[in-house]
């Protein structure tokens, strides 16, 4: 009888819902090709507002939703701190980041790129400095990549 009874719920409800979540892009490694592959993920905005860099790296440590992808970050790695200074994120990781890494230059580069590409998706970030247990100048076991440099996104 009354067409108004069929009206869909007010628009605000979806907007509230959308405001609570945000789409982030995380970079994982394709298990077969070993290439870096982006994966979109909806996450709680609250986490992005309180600890954006730590939140994103912790998501990178977890396994991706897509079964063809895998985390580029070594198992057991913990984020000890993440702080923006200027436009560079100082990312402090636990020793497992070095100790548990599978090694090999390609795998090491993929690990660095996964972190850098994920964090530089945020407008305020142009580079990442990696610390291990608060210390600079650490390196992977292969010694191909030293962490003394600030890593920037390679297009």
Language model features with spans:
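Bimodal "functional hotspot" detector
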Residues: 1-155
